[in-house]
Amino acid sequence: MDEVGKFWQAVWDEMGVVASEKASHPVAENAPMFPPAEWFVGARLNFAENILHFGKDEDVAVIACTEREDDTQRTTYGDLRKQVAQAGHALRSLGIKPGDTVASYSGNTCENLVAFLAASAVGAVWTSVPPDFGTAGVLERFTTVRPRVIFSTNQVLYNGKLHDHIGKLNATIEGLLACLLYTSDAAD
């Protein structure tokens, strides 16, 4: 390709990327493969804003299925935008700000997608573990990133049966609190 920068600028423009600050240039024309080049230098954008920007309010944005054949949930762009805005507002009201970590101990559901997009919308770092992780595995992940908020499910559908998830969640929270209350080796 002779004009790499022009090509990628055309892709950016054609895709309608929403950015609060435009890039000074897409990429240097003669950028080497290694070390990797800087792309779209100076651009500032939000992933969630770009995901939610497209689609008419009445169009289906998400089709979520479970292992039950008759359990399919459809969510429109309008509903998704509204739910993400509400969840984002709730996160902000809890003091979540850019750079804070928000976690999920839940499955791949529409509700979890809403939580992820809301966290992204406020600029938070997102991490998640599936509900089949045991408490030790969740604590190993979460104590490293120290989430300020954890989204979780209260029950899990597995092999046709609903399983309570609250016990594992409570054990995780207790383990995190024990880890997070430790502040110093200094004596009082």
Please annotate each region the language model reported.
Residues 182-188:
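Conserved small/polar residues in nucleotide/adenosyl-binding loops
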Residues 106, 128, 149:
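Phosphate-binding active sites in nucleotide-utilizing proteins
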Residues 123:
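Structured binding elements
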Residues 62-117, 134-139:
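Conserved AMP-binding/adenylate-forming core of the ANL superfamily
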Residues 116, 133-176:
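Conserved ATP-dependent adenylate/AMP-binding module captured primarily in the ANL superfamily
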Residues 6-22, 41-63:
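A short N-terminal helical cap/helix-turn-helix that marks the beginning
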Residues 65, 153, 184:
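Conserved residues at the C-terminal ends of beta-strands
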Residues 20-42, 108:
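Active-site diphosphate/adenylate-binding microenvironment
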